[in-house]
């Protein structure tokens, strides 16, 4: 009996921050910043920064590379990122709250690669700046409109913003583009918005968008969605406004009709991950 109680307490501790509260599944992967610590990657993609470059990125934003203790303090309040990055003194690692088979080797804590002798290795960065102003955010309201930084004025160069939408379990997300004007190029390699039908920007890729044509509406397959906005160091444009509305689960009486209603009315849409209502 004592052993069973002990095992229960261990499991309870492990699940804190990863369960349901007020009908919303809380998963700390959504936290882009905690205790002044935040994750940065190069604008060219993941694992592109040398130690000197990572240090310069943090200092450019008014901060510095996070120490191991600062990263661990952030992890203890829910900071979870599945990407190795430079820390102070040439250390590399990443914070894991929830163990998983594809991230963290099934462990929790700081996955520590130690102090690297080769400072030319390329990783991401973990910066510390408790006073930095970040674009993006986490939304749990049933409907919301969010905008590019400075909208309706043009956005600035060198922006990286994340918006995470997490609704009540069972709901889905109807995403609509109200205004959209980004630098246009054939491969959307300069300025773009990426949409993911998941809780992070690793899984569930839906599409990358640029130019000035309004993308079609998108409906998620679940109650979470992630949007990433990136601008490069040159041309800017008018920016965007994006609206989302929660879609309640289809009632049993309407099953089989392949219909659903939101306050946005009937419009063409792309279902997240190409599923259908």
Swiss-Prot record:
Main location per UniProt?
Answer: secreted
Q: What is its EC number?
A: 3.1.1.-
- What protein name is recorded for this chain? Tumor necrosis factor-inducible gene 6 protein
SS bond list: 58-127, 82-103, 135-161, 188-210
Q: How does it assemble?
A: Interacts (via Link domain) with inter-alpha-inhibitor (I-alpha-I) component bikunin. Interacts with ITIH2/HC2; this interaction is required for transesterification of the HC to hyaluronan. Interacts (via Link and CUB domains) with ITIH1. Chondroitin sulfate may be required for the stability of the complex. Interacts (via Link domain) with various C-X-C and C-C chemokines including PF4, CXCL8, CXCL11, CXCL12, CCL2, CCL7, CCL19, CCL21, and CCL27; this interaction interferes with chemokine binding to glycosaminoglycans.
Quick one: effect of changing residue 39 to K?
Decreases binding of hyaluronan to CD44. Decreases hyaluronan-dependent lymphocyte rolling
Q: Where is the signal peptide?
A: 1-17
Q: Does the keyword Disulfide bond apply?
A: yes
Gene3D superfamilies named among the record's database cross-references: Mannose-Binding Protein A, subunit A, Spermadhesin, CUB domain
Write out the annotated subcellular location. Secreted
Keywords on this record?
Answer: Calcium, Cell adhesion, Disulfide bond, Glycoprotein, Hydrolase, Metal-binding, Secreted, Signal
Cite the CUB domain residue spans from the record. 135-247
> A GO term (biological process) for this protein?
ovarian cumulus expansion
Give the first-level EC class, as a single word. hydrolase
InterPro entries named among the record's database cross-references: C-type_lectin-like/link_sf, CTDL_fold, CUB_dom, Link_dom, Sperma_CUB_dom_sf, Spermadhesin-Link_domain
Q: What does the record say mutating residue 46 to Q does?
A: Abolishes binding to bikunin
Name the encoding gene, please: TNFAIP6
Please provide, alphabetically and separated by semicolons, the GO molecular function terms listed in this UniProt record. calcium ion binding; carboxylesterase activity; fibronectin binding; hyaluronic acid binding
- Glycosylated sites: 118, 258
